[in-house]
From Swiss-Prot:
One of its GO terms (biological process) is proteolysis. Zn(2+) 1 binds at H180, D192, E253. It is an enzyme of class 3 (hydrolase). It comes from Caenorhabditis elegans. This is Putative endoplasmic reticulum metallopeptidase 1-B. Keywords: Coiled coil, Endoplasmic reticulum, Glycoprotein, Hydrolase, Membrane, Metal-binding, Metalloprotease, Protease, Transmembrane, Transmembrane helix, Zinc. It comes from the Eukaryota. Residues 1-27 are annotated as: Disordered. The keyword Ubl conjugation does not apply. It is a multi-pass membrane protein.
């Protein structure tokens, strides 16, 4: 370093730290009065600004239109009319695929409504209205996503279809709308997914009156087996004759009860399809963040979108209600709990989008529209922004390069102050991270997980309050060590360092082609201020500086708060069905917005009047500051926890219950010699959240409930009667089991028979293989667990052939029959991994026959348990439990 540069840095350091050489604090305060620093009034305005911003984004997030009546011209979607049939369908009760409620009551009511609409409009000129039904069978495999992957066979599942068009001849081009009318075994399906079916029936009424809108045919698919792993949609898109004309689809789903429906998947490719929604939707609510989060597998759920995309090779849109997810797949999912205005909003959006889509020239020749990945999001629910990802990359890189250039110039011209600001910026971030980590641990240790489950604002108290408080107070403390005349440069440098960090994050998103990086691009809008400062003087008036800073920070901070509100409202209910520690995820969501606010205000904090002297800004004061933040926050949480000791709440209008699952199981386990080693009746209690099974009141008080102890060493499912392969969602703390006295007596006990066993040798490597044929007899819903010994691998099944040899496999068989009894034949081939002699019985087969409906569904033990829960939860929050419970007949045998 040259002598001139050293001298310049020395002078810079002297000017910056001049405050330490002042003779007394009084002189310091006089200097502060002479320069343009922010006063308390400015900070009152800043606080009011962000308070209004938080309230405003929350209001916009929850805003819904008023339900409407039909208009005289029959051109207006009417929630009031749609909800009448919805209420009737919901009142049929639990309706899993194959049940009487599903196959007779619900299916026939939808058919009746379709026939009534057709009869009422039979004289409408130029209307073609076809109705069809389907009972379909097939097999396919589902890769790991919502579950851990499985092979599925189904038989006799039902579909109801209506096809509307203009003119006598069927159009060769059509658009598909899909809903499902079956339910989770213990749910009325008011929202998931009868609300979508009611919406589609209302659209059929409108198009029946206005066939001139039907430039192409529209197929309405009411499918009867989605909850059983997307079966009916697969049967339709692979076997029905109407499938060949479909050019696009709109899938309507629900993982919550009302609220604003979210477009969270679009494609694959076919940008014109996404544009139809973005250009036509009256109340758009979409985000590429939702699409990328869902496709990552973080969100626990799957929809028929996968089936139409993967097996039909058709592009589409996936729309779903995602708010109020507490009631999804529970007894509380009834029609009356759907937020008023939700169907009106969704119906208007789908109606306008479909009308736009039917006019699109790309529906006839979609290949002529160049496919490209896009960035899309709605800004606070007010309007939609969409642009190609290639343009996003270009803008991102230009912005990043600009920020880096500004930072490089600042580092060269103001080296010491840059190092000083960087040190303080890092200290502020580390302090926020330390406080968050401490609050996560202390809140979990002191008050338990999910305290914010019912009252979301408690998450803001637990994580938002200490983040903002710690960040601003620590930055103010560090600033107190500086000379007042140096704070302008110091504050500007802090702002530039913050922009550089955001640029680094945006660079990573750009490099990995993650479209969600738009959020960080918006946080770089304040770079305009740094550019202006570089080319000219930025006004020193504190009021002007405050207002302009807030205006430039508004797009990024508003979207950060809006996105956090959206993610919290979606993911907090999901935490009730996740066995992972939820505190880090929720603290991160809250801290993201809090951090965006605090760090964007770092420059203003540095340019504010500060009552501290340099002697009051040491390490000890920093420690006291952090401890004070933690102590006050924990005290506030303690006070709130004394009022609400349980995270759950029972309320007929808005219950937030603990999710549980119970299996009453007849369990018969055989050893290799074919002898029965276990013949027991067991009761499995499963908690789906992190608080675990010990949080269930009657489990906690009963010492006979114990943890899992696997009978077979190599059984990854540990004899737990999983309906689907979801063992990865649970850990040891989530499952408790005990023996019970009530032995289940089934009319048709589950049976597994080995039909044949043929040994062979692979001609390529000389290793042995065995081909088995089996027959399984059980209920309409059977889970099969295939578990070879450790020196064997599964190479083939009659359902599908695995891409690579598997250590174990999960098969799921479902069928619809009046007596709920089905027989399945399947083959399995296993291959030895060594050339040692073959074992006599190297294959373990487990069968769980699930009673999901009918008179044998629930034992007296289950009924008594549910009655006790319903009685106690009215007065005791800890008893606020919702239970999915049914009987299972299970057997394991070696072959």
């Amino acid at each position: 370093m040259s002598t001139g540069i050293r001298r310049r840095h020395a002078d810079e350091k002297k000017n910056i730290l001049e405050k330490e050489s002042l003779q007394n604090d009084e002189t310091q305060r006089e200097m502060e009065k002479d320069i343009s620093l922010l006063r308390p009034a400015h900070w009152n305005f800043i606080g009011l600004f962000f308070l209004v911003l938080i309230i405003g984004t929350t209001f916009l997030h929850k805003c819904l239109p008023e339900p409407k009546d039909p208009n005289q011209e029959e051109t207006q979607f009417s929630e009031k009319r749609a909800v009448k049939v919805l209420q009737e369908l919901s009142d049929y009760g639990w309706k899993p695929a194959g049940s009487y409620n599903c196959e007779e009551l619900t299916r026939n009511r939808i058919l009746k409504e379709l026939n009534d609409i057709r009869s009422q409009n039979q004289n409408v000129e130029n209307l073609r209205f076809d109705i069809d039904t389907q009972y379909v069978s097939g097999c396919f495999d589902i890769p790991a996503h919502d579950t851990e992957g499985m092979n599925i066979c189904y038989r006799n599942v039902s579909n109801v279809m209506a096809r509307l068009g203009k003119g006598e001849k069927k159009d060769k081009i059509s658009v598909l709308l899909n809903c499902h009318y079956d339910s989770w075994p213990t749910s009325n399906a008011g929202s998931d997914d009868l609300s979508s079916c009611a919406l589609m029936l209302e659209l059929i009424r409108l198009y029946s009156k206005n066939p001139h809108l039907l430039n192409h045919d529209v197929i309405f698919l009411f499918n009867g087996a989605e909850e059983s792993s997307l079966l009916a949609a697969h049967g339709f898109i692979t076997q029905h004759s109407w499938r060949h004309e479909i050019r696009a689809f709109i899938n309507l789903e629900a993982s919550g009860s009302g609220g604003r429906e979210l477009l969270f998947q679009a494609g694959p490719a076919n940008q014109w399809l996404l544009n139809s929604y973005l250009e036509a939707a009256i109340h758009p609510h979409c985000s590429v963040i939702g699409q990328e989060v869902f496709q990552s597998g973080v969100y626990p759920g799957d929809t028929d979108f996968r089936i139409f995309r993967d097996h039909g090779r058709v592009p589409g849109l996936d729309l779903a209600f995602v708010q109020n997810g507490y009631w999804w797949h529970t007894e509380f999912d009834t029609a009356e709990r759907i937020t008023k205005g939700s169907l009106q909003r969704a119906g208007e959006n789908v109606y306008s989008t479909l009308n736009h889509l039917l006019k699109s020239p790309y529906l006839e020749k979609p290949a002529e529209y160049a496919d490209r990945k896009t960035v899309f999001f709605d800004f606070l629910g007010l309007f939609v922004i969409i642009y190609p990802l290639s343009i996003a990359h270009l803008v991102n890189m230009l912005t990043i390069c600009t920020v880096i250039a500004l930072m490089s110039h600042r580092f060269y011209s103001k080296t010491f102050i840059t190092f000083l600001a960087l040190r303080d910026y890092v200290l502020t971030i580390l302090t926020i991270a330390l406080v968050l980590k401490a609050m996560t641990f202390m809140s979990l240790f002191t008050y338990g997980a999910l305290r914010w489950y019912t009252r979301h604002w408690l998450a803001l108290v637990a994580y938002g309050l200490p983040s903002v408080w710690a960040g601003i107070s620590v930055q103010g403390l560090l600033t107190a060590r500086l000379a007042p005349k140096a704070r302008e440069e110091y504050g500007s440098t802090l702002e530039l360092i913050h922009l550089t960090l955001i640029s680094g994050i945006l660079l990573a998103f750009t490099y990995y082609d993650i479209a969600s990086g738009f959020l960080f691009a918006l946080l770089l809008v304040p770079a305009i201020k740094s550019i202006i400062t570089y080319f000219g003087a930025w006004p020193t008036c504190p009021t002007f500086n405050t207002i302009l800073t807030l205006i430039l920070s508004f797009p990024g901070c508003a979207m950060a708060i809006y996105t956090t509100e959206m993610l919290l409202s979606i993911f907090i209910p999901i935490m009730g069905r996740s066995s992972y520690n939820p505190e880090p995820a929720v603290s991160f969501f809250v801290a993201f917005s809090a951090g965006c606010i605090v760090l964007s205000l770092g420059g203003l904090v540095a340019k504010s009047r500060n009552s501290r002297s340099s002697n009051e800004a040491g390490l000890l004061e920093l420690i006291y500051n952090i401890l004070g933040v933690l102590l006050v926050t924990l005290t506030i949480l303690y006070v709130f926890s004394s009022f609400w000791p349980s995270p759950y709440r029972f309320d007929n209008v808005y219950p937030t219950a603990k999710r549980t699952q119970f299996f009453h199981v007849n369990q018969m386990l055989y050893d290799r010699n074919g002898q029965i080693s276990v013949n027991d009746t067991r009761f499995y209690a499963i908690s789906h959240d992190y608080r675990g099974a010990e949080d269930i009141p009657f489990v906690k008080k009963d010492p006979e409930y114990t943890g899992l102890q696997c009978h077979y060493e190599n059984n990854p499912w540990c004899e737990t009667p999983f309906l689907f392969p979801t063992k990865g969602r649970l850990n040891e703390r989530n499952i408790r089991v005990r023996s019970v006295d009530e032995r289940l007596k089934f009319k048709h006990p589950v049976k597994i028979l080995g039909i044949s066993k043929r040994h062979g040798v692979d001609s390529k490597d000389g290793k042995g293989n065995i081909e088995y044929s089996f027959s399984v007899i059980g209920t309409g819903q059977i889970s099969v667990y295939i578990i070879p010994d450790t020196t064997w691998l599964i190479t083939n099944t009659s359902v599908t052939q695995p891409k690579t040899p598997q250590e174990n496999m999960f098969l799921y068989y479902t069928c619809s029959t009046p007596n709920n009894i089905c027989e399945w034949m399947f083959k399995v081939t296993i291959k030895k991994t060594t050339q040692t002699p073959s074992d006599d019985k190297p294959l373990l087969i487990g069968i769980s026959s699930h009673y999901l409906h009918g008179p044998e569904m629930q034992s007296e033990s289950i009924k008594n348990m549910i009655a006790k829960i319903q009685e106690n939860r009215v007065n005791s929050p800890e008893w606020t439990v919702t239970a999915s419970a049914w009987n299972v007949d299970q057997v394991y045998k070696y072959f």
